[in-house]
Every structure is written in structure tokens, then in C-alpha cells.
Amino acid sequence: MLFRSKAKYLPAIVAGDIVFCQGYSEPGSGSDLASLKTRAVRDGDDYVINGTKIWTTGAHVADHMFCLVRTAAEGKQQDGISFVLIDSMKTPGLTVKPIVTLAGDHEVNQVFFDNVRTPVANRIGPENAGWTVAKYLLEFERGGDAYTPNLYARLEDVRRIAREEAADGSGRLIAEPAFAERLAEAEIDIQTLEMIELQVLSDLSRGRNPGTVSSSMKIRGSETLQKLDHLGVEALAWYAAPFEPEARQLGHNEPTVVPEMGITAMPLYLNNRAATIYAGSNEIQRNIIAKAALGL
């Protein structure tokens, strides 16, 4: 099954012809993902799926979904989960409802399954072994992202704001020792993360998995991102306050009430509050490091 799925999907994914969304989190099953309730019952050559997924990024534009479903209720929670593919987001019984974020964006959704059928052949790995597949995938999701290019770009944005904004009417914000110190701390965090990322890339090129280092990367990357967002909003002050989500839409050409950077600073700040939660909260990542790396 796995090899057929690779042949069917991987070339189209690489070519950018199809997009998958990820069906993991559920209402009440986020950080405690193994408690998920979405059920798949075998019916001949199909699974019949009922339940719901939430915070599903891009479900409204995706072609397919990979998701975790419960196929057994006995034993440990982790032992009754399977990893399946949904061939089409237009499958009968599958409904996508938007969730608009605090920033006014539609990025995430709630997905409902009402007797949705998917072939048993779309299962990845053995039945009831989906937890192992999901953990492997999350290891690369946390450690496979290159945080530093985005963080360096964001750092330069904040520096540019600080060079242009006055501080209490005397000089520029960039010259304020306290603010400059926090910028320097953020840059050190990024440089440290960059070294870790390069080490992980080196390991991957040798066929090694990132292991618990991926949890360290996720913690440092997401917390540094939030630190920069906070500095950006602080530097812009009231310029970051206006709520103009339409100004960030493709094709919008009306004048805005604040400078360009003021349009994105607060939405980034609000959206990235979730960076320390998704893909496994940072508290969970610290638990993983404590158990797997430190043996605590």
C-alpha cells in the first residue's frame, strides 16, 4: 500500500500539482492528540469515517487530506490509531467550515466527517500503527522547517522600523540601549538556531533522523519568532493598531491609514501566538526532551 501511495502522490506533490492538509487535532484532542475520537470502521474494502478535525490549515484549498483516525478502542490510546489518506476534499460527507483568526485571516478550518468513505488501500502502514507514522512525520515537521531565513528577514524588518521611529522625541529607537539589547539577544537566538539547523541538515544528508533536536528547534524557533513580533509591534506603537485585513489581500490597491509595515505587524503578532502551540506545544516538546534525551 505504501509503495502504491508513493507512486500515486509523490510526483504530483513535488510538481506542486496537488496540496494535502493535515487532519490531526480535534476539539479536546490537541496536545493530548492520542485521545482523538474520530472513528474509522471497516466496511469491506473501505473505512467509514465519522468525527471532526479542527485547526486544519489550508483545508479550504487542499485537494487531499492525511489524517489520524481511531480504528480500535482497546488497549492504550496510541495503539488504536491508524493513518489514512482522503482522496478528495470533495468526498461525499466531508464538510469544511472556516475559522477566522483574531487577525481576520481564513487559514484554519474545522472539518466534519459524516460517513466519509476512504479505501483501506489508502492506509499508510499497518492498521492501529498510525501513531508511529504520525510521530515520525511530526519529528520532521518540527525539525524540517528552516526557521532562520524567515527570522533573519523579520529581524531586519524590526531594525528598519527602529531606525525610522523616534524614541520619546529624542533620537531613534534603534539607539535606545534597552531596545538595542533586546534586538541583539534576538539575533543571538537566531544565530544559535541556525547552527542547530545546519547540524540537522548535515545529519539528514547522512540518513539520520533529527530526533529530539527537532523539539529544540521548534521551541527556539517559535519563541524567537514571537519575540521579534513583540519587538515589531512595540517599535511601531500606534501604527500597529489599525485593523485592516482587507489591505493584506491580493489585488488590494487602496491607500492605507498607516505605513506598510504597520499593516502586517499586528496580524503577525496575533497569528504567531499559535506558533508555540501547533505541531505539539512547547510544553510537550520540553517533556519529549526530558524523557527521550535526558531520561527524566
Descriptions of predicted regions:
Residues 16-24:
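A short, Trp-centered hydrophobic/proline-enriched beta-strand micro-motif
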Residues 133-140, 144-148, 239-296:
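Glycine-rich phosphate/cofactor-binding loops in nucleotide/flavin-utilizing enzymes
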Residues 54-59, 102-103, 274-281:
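Glycine-rich phosphate/pyrophosphate-binding beta-alpha loops
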Residues 94-193, 275, 291:
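Glycine-rich beta->alpha junctions and the first turn(s) of the following alpha-helix
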Residues 167-170, 191-255:
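C-terminal helix-coil-helix/basic helical segment that borders enzyme active sites and/or dimer interfaces
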Residues 38-40, 155:
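A structural signal for short hydrophobic beta-strand segments in well-ordered beta-sheet cores
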Residues 46, 50-97:
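A short core secondary-structure module
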Residues 1-2:
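Short, small-residue-biased leader/transition segments that mark boundaries at the very start
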